[in-house]
Structures are given as structure tokens and as C-alpha cells.
């Protein structure tokens, strides 16, 4: 039987909209406008004609790590495509998972509202990114412009969103 429950999709859209607001507010001094679910999940248009490209990937349960690898690969693929446009100021992977690299040893880096540049990520996370980039031929993404954002967003209680 086909599952027609749209709650996971609605949750993902809600997370994406909230992530867009957080990213926009973080860049308010340099931002002109924002587009959500246009060509990309999130695009922030900056005053200097450059853009912040962000891929928002959510999990409905904080302890569900079954899709984090697939989410990371999908985000890297799209951000790699965005890098070809040559107008990117930043390429952001934003998620609500406290375990975005599916590695228990790195979880302490990702609890709460977290923003880490590529160079600030734990070694095992950086190696995983490089391995995925190499394995999937994502050759355009500039890791000096790559960052990871964790935005807590779990459950039905709006205080947790």
C-alpha cells in the first residue's frame, strides 16, 4: 500500500522556510532578497550580486540517522552544481540532525544551533566530505566556501522549532 501521509514533506518544507529565515537574518547586513524553493532550496541574493546557496535537509526525529548520508550526498551534489554558476559567496548545508555525518564521535560538535566552516569541522567529517566529493565527482565545489549549519527543529511543539 502506498503511503500518502504528507507529514514528512510538510515538516521538510516547514524546516526549509525556517532555515531560510535564520540564514537571512544571519546575513541581513549584506542581503538584498531571498528565494525559497525556487531553483534551489534557499538562495540569498547579496548586495554585491553574489549569492549564498543553501541546501536544507531535515529529519523528523533527532535520533533517526537513516537518511543523513543520503541527505549529505544530495546536498553536496546540488551545491556542486551551484558552484558551476560562479556567483556563489557561500555554499551551505543546513540540517536539523545532531548527527549530520552519521558518526557518533562527531555529535558533540553539532548539538544546538551550530555554524561551522569546512576547516572547523572535525577531521572525520572533513574526510567524509572529501571522500564523497571524490567518489561522486563533485569537482566544482569550493570547500573554502562550504559551511554546515545545524538548526534545532524537532517535534510538534513550536517551542522546539
Segments (PLM) and residue ranges:
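Catalytic centers of nucleases
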Residues: 5, 9-78
Amino acid at each position: 500500500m502506498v503511503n500518502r501521509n504528507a507529514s514528512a514533506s510538510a515538516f521538510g518544507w516547514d524546516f526549509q522556510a525556517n532555515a531560510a529565515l535564520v540564514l537571512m537574518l544571519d546575513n541581513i547586513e549584506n542581503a538584498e532578497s531571498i528565494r525559497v524553493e525556487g531553483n534551489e532550496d534557499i538562495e540569498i541574493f547579496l548586495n554585491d550580486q553574489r549569492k549564498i546557496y543553501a541546501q536544507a535537509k531535515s529529519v523528523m526525529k533527532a535520533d533517526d540517522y537513516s537518511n543523513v548520508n543520503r541527505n549529505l550526498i544530495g546536498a553536496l551534489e546540488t551545491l556542486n552544481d551551484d558552484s558551476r554558476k560562479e556567483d556563489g559567496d557561500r555554499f551551505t548545508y543546513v540540517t536539523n540532525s545532531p548527527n549530520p555525518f552519521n558518526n557518533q564521535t562527531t555529535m558533540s560538535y553539532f548539538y544546538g544551533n551550530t555554524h561551522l566552516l569546512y576547516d572547523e569541522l572535525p577531521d572525520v567529517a572533513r574526510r567524509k566530505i572529501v571522500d564523497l566529493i571524490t567518489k561522486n565527482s563533485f569537482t566544482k565545489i569550493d570547500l573554502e566556501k562550504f559551511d554546515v549549519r545545524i538548526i534545532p527543529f524537532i517535534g510538534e511543539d513550536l517551542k522546539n522549532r
